[in-house]
Amino acid sequence: ECADVYKECWYPEKPCCKDRACQCSLGMNCKCKATLGDIF
C-alpha cells in the first residue's frame, strides 16, 4: 500500500506512490509532496 499525493506517509509501512518525496514537519506530520507531473 502506498500513500497518494498530499496524504500521510511513513516508512517503511506506507511510502508515497510513484516515488514521491515524503516530507515531514518537525518529524511528526509526514505528507507526500507533489511532483511536477502532478502540477501540470
Curated annotation (Swiss-Prot):
Keywords of the record: Disulfide bond, Knottin, Neurotoxin, Secreted, Toxin
Cysteine pairings via disulfide bonds: 2-17, 9-22, 16-32, 24-30
Main localisation: secreted
Tissues where this protein is expressed: Expressed by the venom gland.
Presence of the UniProt keyword Metal-binding in the record: no
A GO cellular component entry from the record: extracellular region
Gene Ontology MF terms in the entry: ion channel inhibitor activity; toxin activity
Domain of life the protein comes from: Eukaryota
Compartments where located: Secreted
Family affiliation: Belongs to the neurotoxin 02 (plectoxin) family. 01 (Tx3) subfamily.
Domain note: The presence of a 'disulfide through disulfide knot' structurally defines this protein as a knottin.
General function of this protein: Neurotoxin.
UniProt-recorded name of the protein: U2-ctenitoxin-Pr1a
Organism: Phoneutria reidyi (Brazilian Amazonian armed spider)
